[in-house]
Amino acid sequence: MIPATRSLLCAALLLLATSRLATGAPIANELRCQCLQTMAGIHLKNIQSLKVLPSGPHCTQTEVIATLKNGREACLDPEAPLVQKIVQKMLKGVPK
């Protein structure tokens, strides 16, 4: 192979390998807590689904996020007794 062609091929491969990094592709989904404020409770009939995010490197708190029937999301206080009851009721409704 001609040295100029080899150099050109190496440069193209290097450019291709680093272009993914240059696009700004996210490394992780979210690296912070999603809930800035929490509610002590909400009526169960307004909840469509419930998501419990355990604490981890992204956030030191367990987060409970309820998706409401109107499409909005609400952050619930995982320490509140009413929220704990809601989580238990939602878990009982999930088939094993």
UniProtKB/Swiss-Prot annotation:
Q: Which GO terms describe its cellular component?
A: extracellular space
Q: List the disulfide bonds.
A: 33-59, 35-75
Protein's UniProt keywords contain Secreted: yes
Xref: InterPro entries: Chemokine_b/g/d, Chemokine_CXC, Chemokine_CXC_CS, Chemokine_IL8-like_dom, CXC_Chemokine_domain, Interleukin_8-like_sf
A Gene Ontology molecular function term for this protein is: chemokine activity
Q: What induces it?
A: By platelet-derived growth factor. In lung, by lipopolysaccharide or inflammation.
Localization recorded for this chain is: Secreted
Changes after translation: The N-terminal processed form KC(5-72) is produced by proteolytic cleavage after secretion from bone marrow stromal cells.
Q: Which Pfam families match?
A: IL8
What keywords were assigned to this record? Cytokine, Disulfide bond, Growth factor, Inflammatory response, Secreted, Signal
Q: Where is the signal peptide?
A: 1-24
Q: Which GO terms describe its biological process?
A: cellular response to interleukin-17; immune response; inflammatory response; positive regulation of hematopoietic stem cell proliferation; positive regulation of neutrophil mediated killing of fungus; positive regulation of superoxide anion generation
Q: Where's it mainly located?
A: secreted
Family label: Belongs to the intercrine alpha (chemokine CxC) family.
Its function, per the record, reads: Has chemotactic activity for neutrophils. Contributes to neutrophil activation during inflammation. Hematoregulatory chemokine, which, in vitro, suppresses hematopoietic progenitor cell proliferation. KC(5-72) shows a highly enhanced hematopoietic activity.
The entry's protein name is: Growth-regulated alpha protein
**Organism for this UniProt entry:** Mus musculus (Mouse)
Q: Corresponding gene?
A: Cxcl1
